């Protein structure tokens, strides 16, 4: 039968005319990709998949409980006949509703909106409703059975955290107007959780690809004789199913062992051949054949493999020595049951009972069917397939041992997956649900059967016992544990006093600006922190940019310092994370394809002798084919048609081992790429005709030749349609113009870096591209904010990705309806004169400042910046800073109000209570230090004195900086407790010491606010807003900022905004002509006057507009720590650190430069010495040992020299003295040498 072929044909590539397509037009393809999926759409889709498929699948399929226990009840004669009771129950329906909360004033439940949860400190969670079927069976000694059944109607068990913006959220599919009406940001994408009033993000987590063999060399350690290991995690399905791991080890003794990691199997290294014998393959030759495939082959590789395998069979294993050469599989299974089984406490006690032995053996095989390679099947009829697959795994490990193939690249995204919030929460839910729901139900039934005779049980008894087990405490356990897994971030959480490993990685959502919010939602974390924290080569490799990153992981954005360097990454701008696809339909299509022979129809010898390629789907070996390349190409064309294969299916041909892999599992990174078509078939035919004509002596044989052409079908008109909104990415996929590629399949592609490279090799038949890329796609959103990033040192771009997330701006549009702690709202934000594609998706967070690059006095050394006072007065970088004060009424004896001094005691001395109205300072009131902002009193119980009825518990404002009361609220908490919530507003103008940054990562600190009259100016009267040290650029190589200033100068004079996205071409000649048209020099430098003397500067000054951002590091917040006194460490006497301990402020490098610029060197000495731990130390000049000085009685004494001592005073530090004491305690003496006395004549 002829295989099915694709039906759609595309027009000749020679007719495609896209010569007008520019690199700027190619940016529209990025816009199409972002508009299609959204910047965080994958996160919402992952959670929706959990709600619609994951939770129902987990509850219904994985928690079908079937346990039998010995009956303990013996009250009656019937009870004594009852030997055991079997408890069976399964959940028949699972439903998760939208968030609700109880309205205590009305006594009913109402919808819980996200902003209500934020203000009231609630968790945005939806009710979880379950329905179940219960079967209780009593087994009597006379063989009789009695069955009781009950159907549990749906009822609420607990609540589950709901993601903002998901299909279970009240804002789902709401219009922008409707979102405004409920106090939500109309442009906010969602993708986060609200737990106990705070906003949290579940990070994307790197994980290894399941159903894939990962082979690694093992470091030789003491007591470990392992050379190499292969790890294989088998998971049926592709998303939420349970997995099982096996570890295959090759030891220095030549032994090959297999360890099965499962909760039903004790960890034990079993000789590999025993697994084959247990499944019915007893002959050594047939076992070895499963690994080498062809015993008759005389190839060196085959011969060496057979030698290794034969040696491994004869290596003595002390544990399995009794069955090492045992051919009887029943005895092997029985021996294994005694060693590794967990389902019976003492298997050896059953040896005398043949029926019991047979039962144990069958039970053991049934467990092995479920936990050994379950993705290949979980029934007895799949055992042969499993053995063949296990032989293939050992075969690949032996090839690595012989250095035929390299070990697995641990850092390549070809063998990795990125799991979103849905998969992470599913892992936590499995463990928590088992502990907080399943265990109480089982215990509840056991208690019921202990108290009530089985024959007296009714359906009502069973339903009541089931419901009582899932009481309020159980509901709170499940809900509280899920919240804890999101909030705590701990590796271990406690559920019913039982530790459970938390596999959810989260971070608090700090809304500094919209870029910060989106970056937090696109963070990818590597959770292997054990190896990363070590100073090893492996730790260094984990942090490097891998060759598989471009297009999927941003190559520029990561932490710039600390342990998170290279461990916390960002998705590239067009990257997306796939959910699990429909495997069954594709599997059936592949098995029905005549080009594929099913695995059962192919022998191992045929695979080698006929050169067959293996075919896998989600890691399951389903068959073989004769032409792997043709099969992969044919199904890629099916995918391009969009009929048989889903567009997000991964089709990968591994030419090294000749395998075709189809992947539809969850967590695959994918990105769209434009397809490149060519006329290779016509070209080959023309070359063949030309060669034939030449053979025949035709002198005009060259006329038969045609040029080779390769091109993309994407045109400039399509780019315009995308920008106009009439063409989407889905349309491009449906038309076969682009397709989705994963890191695996990228290895089968030859991708042109840009449209320019494609055109350069348009007729080069030796470089046939499969796709063309957009250069900007290798960067993430934060990196694309930097203009001309490809001209800037990469480290500076990395700094900008972190600084851009700390800048002040508009953190959300719903700020009037929110009460946030430590949030800065910048008044004026401008669109940059040189914008980038990132500004299409995030609000700009800065100003176009006029910057002069020059030295002007001594106040802009290093990173110091001189700021124009008029720029500050005009509101440059000005904004509002918000704090919150939250007070709870802890009991019914407390109330809000203005304390009456006649009947209230413990009033705060010196406090001002006059501004209180009904317990709160009114909105718009200015409060200062010492003002009471929230009045609260508590009634003294049992107090008979009429003058002391109440005690004051008011909140006093304790900051030196005045504030304005911006909002006052009285929300109710989850248990109807009343809160007092106040939002305070502070003015945050630019101050000396505040930090700024350009978009090229060049950070500066305001060192001087210079009056307008002293600022330099150009011939046109233009004065700079900032004066920046030009020496900060050559060493940092921030060429992108220089280009931005030059282009911005031309744009400002001509009144246009241009695109400065990275990798766009820069025409220096055209830029110089634009400047010349405006009467400037070709390089943008201008003649300037000294504002203080009025004289010309000798050199031309480079001046122009540069986009600057203000970082949220405010000097006013740190002034509390600037003093000559404060708490100190008891041992060293040094000031404490941090606001919590009221400690001092760290004097950093940039602060040091500011003080140096101000000529305050003595201040530095004073703060780092006198105000720290400076002290006087007394030392004997004769022996160099410490001396003793009594301050109350001026007595100097040396323990060594006594009266001959010559003691001198030395300016020292307490930390130095403590160090010397520690060294002497370690028996290491330290002596000091003092300069001799110098006597001056009178």
Swiss-Prot record:
Keyword list (alphabetical) reads: DNA-directed RNA polymerase, Host cytoplasm, Late protein, Metal-binding, Nucleotidyltransferase, Transcription, Transferase, Viral transcription, Virion, Zinc, Zinc-finger
Enzyme superclass (EC): transferase
Q: Which GO terms describe its molecular function?
A: DNA binding; DNA-directed RNA polymerase activity; ribonucleoside binding; zinc ion binding
Q: Where are the zinc fingers (C4-type)?
A: 1180-1201
Q: Give the principal location in a single coarse category.
A: host cell
Q: What is its EC number?
A: 2.7.7.6
* Compartment list: Host cytoplasm; Virion
Q: Which Gene3D superfamilies match?
A: 2.40.50.150, 3.90.1100.10, DNA-directed RNA polymerase, subunit 2, domain 6, RNA polymerase alpha subunit dimerisation domain, RNA polymerase Rpb2, domain 2
Q: What induces it?
A: Expressed in the late phase of the viral replicative cycle.
Gene Ontology cellular-component terms for this entry are: DNA-directed RNA polymerase complex; host cell cytoplasm; virion component
> Which catalytic reaction applies to this protein?
RNA(n) + a ribonucleoside 5'-triphosphate = RNA(n+1) + diphosphate
Q: Name one GO biological process term.
A: DNA-templated viral transcription
Which InterPro entries does the UniProt entry name for this protein? DNA-dir_RNA_pol_su2 (IPR015712), DNA-dir_RNAP_su2_dom (IPR007120), DNA-dir_RNAP_su2_hyb_sf (IPR037033), RNA_pol_bsu_CS (IPR007121), RNA_pol_bsu_protrusion (IPR007644), RNA_pol_Rpb2_2 (IPR007642), RNA_pol_Rpb2_2_sf (IPR037034), RNA_pol_Rpb2_3 (IPR007645)
Write one Pfam family the protein is assigned to: RNA_pol_Rpb2_2
Nucleotide-binding listed as a keyword: no
Say yes or no: keyword Zinc-finger present: yes
Q: What does this protein do?
A: Catalytic component of the DNA-directed RNA polymerase (RNAP) that catalyzes the transcription in the cytoplasm of viral DNA into RNA using the four ribonucleoside triphosphates as substrates. Forms the polymerase active center together with RPB1. Part of the core element with the central large cleft, the clamp element that moves to open and close the cleft and the jaws that are thought to grab the incoming DNA template.
Something else the entry says is:
The binding of ribonucleoside triphosphate to the RNA polymerase transcribing complex probably involves a two-step mechanism. The initial binding seems to occur at the entry (E) site and involves a magnesium ion coordinated by three conserved aspartate residues of the two largest RNA Pol subunits.
Assigned protein family: Belongs to the RNA polymerase beta chain family.
Quaternary structure, per UniProt, is: Part of the viral DNA-directed RNA polymerase that consists of 8 polII-like subunits (RPB1, RPB2, RPB3, RPB5, RPB6, RPB7, RPB9, RPB10), a capping enzyme and a termination factor.
Any idea what this protein is called?
DNA-directed RNA polymerase RPB2 homolog
Q: Which organism is it from?
A: African swine fever virus (strain Badajoz 1971 Vero-adapted) (Ba71V)
């Amino acid at each position: 039968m002829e295989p099915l072929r694709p039906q759609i044909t595309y027009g000749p590539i020679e007719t495609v005319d896209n010569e007008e397509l520019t690199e700027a037009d190619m940016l529209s393809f990025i816009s199409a990709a972002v508009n299609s999926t959204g910047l965080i759409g994958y996160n919402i889709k992952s959670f929706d998949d959990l709600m619609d498929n994951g939770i129902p699948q987990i509850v219904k399929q994985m928690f079908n409980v079937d346990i039998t226990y010995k009956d303990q009840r013996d009250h009656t004669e019937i009870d004594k006949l009852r030997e055991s009771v079997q408890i069976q129950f399964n959940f028949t329906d699972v439903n998760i509703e939208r968030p609700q909360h109880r309205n205590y004033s009305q006594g009913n439940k109402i919808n819980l909106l996200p902003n209500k949860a934020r203000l009231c400190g609630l968790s945005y969670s939806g009710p979880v409703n379950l329905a179940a079927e219960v079967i209780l069976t009593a087994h009597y000694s006379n063989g009789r059975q009695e069955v009781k059944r009950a159907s549990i109607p749906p009822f609420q068990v607990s609540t589950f955290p709901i993601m903002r913006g998901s299909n279970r959220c009240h804002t789902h599919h709401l219009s922008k107007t409707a979102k405004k009406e409920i106090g939500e940001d109309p442009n906010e994408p969602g993708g986060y959780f609200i737990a106990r009033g705070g906003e949290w993000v579940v990070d994307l987590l790197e994980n290894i690809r399941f159903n894939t063999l990962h082979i690694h060399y093992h470091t030789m350690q003491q007591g470990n004789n392992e050379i190499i290991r292969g790890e294989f995690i088998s998971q049926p399905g592709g998303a939420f199913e349970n997995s099982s791991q096996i570890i295959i080890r090759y030891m220095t003794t030549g032994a090959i062992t297999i360890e099965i990691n499962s909760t039903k199997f004790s960890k034990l290294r079993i000789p590999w051949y025993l697994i084959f014998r247990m499944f019915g393959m007893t002959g050594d030759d047939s076992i070895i054949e499963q690994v080498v495939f062809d015993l008759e082959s005389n190839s060196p590789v085959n011969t060496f493999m057979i030698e290794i395998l034969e040696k491994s069979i004869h290596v003595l294993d002390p544990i399995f020595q009794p069955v090492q050469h045992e051919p009887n599989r029943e005895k092997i299974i029985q021996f294994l049951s005694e060693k590794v089984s967990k389902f019976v406490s003492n298997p050896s006690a059953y040896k005398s009972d043949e029926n019991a032995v047979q039962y144990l053996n069958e039970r053991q095989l049934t467990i092995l069917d479920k936990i050994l390679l379950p993705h290949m099947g979980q029934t007895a009829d799949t055992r042969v397939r499993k053995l063949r697959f296990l032989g293939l795994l050992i075969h690949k490990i032996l090839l690595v041992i012989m250095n035929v193939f390299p070990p697995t690249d641990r850092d390549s995204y070809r063998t990795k997956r990125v799991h979103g919030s849905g998969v992470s929460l599913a892992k936590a839910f499995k463990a928590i649900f088992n502990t907080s729901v399943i265990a109480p139900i089982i215990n509840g039934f056991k208690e019921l059967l202990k108290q009530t005779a089985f024959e007296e049980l009714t359906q009502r008894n069973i339903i009541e016992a089931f419901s009582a087990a899932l009481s309020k405490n159980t509901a709170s356990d499940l809900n509280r544990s899920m919240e804890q897994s999101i909030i705590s971030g701990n590796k271990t959480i406690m559920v019913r006093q039982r530790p459970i490993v938390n596999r959810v990685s989260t971070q608090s959502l700090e809304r500094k600006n919209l870029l910060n919010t989106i970056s937090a939602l696109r963070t990818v974390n590597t959770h292997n922190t054990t190896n990363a924290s070590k100073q090893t080569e492996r730790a260094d490799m984990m942090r490097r940019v891998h060759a598989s990153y471009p297009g999927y992981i941003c190559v520029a954005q990561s932490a710039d310092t600390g342990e998170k360097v290279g461990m916390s990454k960002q998705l590239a701008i067009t990257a997306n994370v796939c959910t699990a696809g429909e495997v069954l339909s594709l599997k059936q299509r592949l098995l029905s394809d005549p080009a594929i022979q099913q695995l059962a129809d192919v022998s191992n010898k045929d695979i080698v002798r006929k050169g067959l390629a293996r075919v896998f789907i989600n890691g399951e070996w389903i068959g073989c084919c004769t032409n792997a390349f043709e099969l992969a190409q044919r199904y890629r064309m099916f995918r391009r048609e969009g009929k048989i294969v889903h567009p997000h299916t991964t089709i990968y041909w591994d030419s090294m081992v000749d395998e075709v892999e189809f992947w539809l599992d969850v967590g695959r990174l994918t990105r769209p790429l434009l397809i490149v078509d060519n006329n290779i078939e016509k070209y080959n035919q023309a070359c063949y005709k030309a060669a034939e004509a030449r053979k025949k002596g035709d002198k005009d044989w060259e006329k038969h030749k045609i040029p080779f052409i390769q091109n993309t079908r994407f045109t400039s008109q399509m780019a315009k349609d995308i920008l106009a909104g009439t063409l989407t990415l889905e349309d491009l996929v449906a038309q076969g113009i682009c397709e989705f590629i994963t890191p695996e399949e990228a290895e089968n592609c030859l991708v042109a870096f840009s449209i320019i490279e494609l055109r350069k090799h348009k007729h080069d038949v030796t470089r046939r591209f499969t796709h063309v890329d957009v250069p900007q796609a290798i960067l993430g959103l934060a990196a694309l904010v930097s203009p001309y990033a490809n001209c800037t040192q990469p480290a500076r771009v990395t700094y900008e990705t972190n600084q851009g997330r700390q800048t002040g701006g508009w953190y959300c549009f719903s700020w009037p309806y929110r009460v946030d702690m430590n949030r800065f709202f910048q008044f004026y934000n401008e669109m940059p004169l040189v914008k980038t594609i990132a500004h299409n998706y995030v609000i700009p967070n800065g100003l176009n400042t006029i910057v002069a690059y020059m030295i002007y006095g001594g106040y802009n050394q290093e990173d110091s910046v001189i700021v124009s006072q008029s720029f500050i007065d005009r509101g440059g970088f000005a904004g509002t800073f918000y704090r919150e004060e939250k007070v709870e009424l802890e009991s019914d004896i407390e109330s809000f109000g203005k304390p009456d001094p006649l009947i209230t005691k413990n009033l705060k001395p010196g406090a001002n209570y006059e501004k209180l109205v009904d317990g709160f300072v009114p909105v718009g009131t200015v409060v200062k230090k010492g003002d009471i902002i929230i009045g609260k009193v508590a009634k003294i119980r049992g107090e008979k004195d009429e003058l002391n009825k109440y005690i004051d518990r008011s909140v006093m404002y304790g900051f030196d900086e005045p504030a304005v009361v911006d909002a006052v609220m009285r929300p109710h908490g989850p248990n109807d407790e009343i809160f007092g919530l106040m939002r305070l507003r502070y003015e945050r103008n630019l101050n000396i010491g505040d930090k700024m940054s350009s978009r090229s990562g060049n950070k500066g600190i305001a060192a001087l606010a210079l009056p307008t009259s002293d600022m330099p100016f150009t011939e046109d009267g233009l004065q700079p807003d900032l004066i920046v040290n030009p020496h900060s650029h050559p060493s940092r190589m921030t060429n992108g900022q220089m280009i931005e200033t030059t282009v911005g100068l031309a744009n400002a004079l001509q009144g246009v905004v241009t695109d400065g996205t990275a990798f766009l071409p820069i025409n220096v000649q055209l830029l110089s002509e634009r400047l010349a048209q405006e009467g400037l020099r070709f390089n943008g430098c201008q003649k300037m006057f000294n504002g203080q003397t009025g004289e010309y500067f000798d050199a031309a000054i480079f001046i122009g507009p540069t986009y600057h951002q203000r970082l949220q590091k405010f000097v006013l917040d740190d002034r509390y720590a600037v003093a000559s006194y404060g708490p100190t460490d008891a041992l060293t006497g040094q000031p404490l650190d941090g606001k919590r301990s009221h400690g001092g402020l760290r004097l950093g490098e940039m602060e040091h430069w500011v003080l140096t610029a101000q000529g305050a060197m003595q201040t530095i000495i004073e703060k780092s010495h006198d105000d720290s731990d400076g002290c006087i130390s007394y030392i004997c000049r004769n022996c160099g040992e410490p001396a003793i000085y009594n301050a109350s009685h001026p007595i100097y004494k040396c323990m060594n020299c006594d009266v001959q001592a010559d003691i001198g005073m030395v300016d020292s530090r307490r930390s130095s003295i403590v160090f010397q004491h520690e060294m002497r305690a370690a028996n290491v003496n330290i002596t000091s040498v003092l300069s001799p006395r110098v006597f001056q004549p009178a």
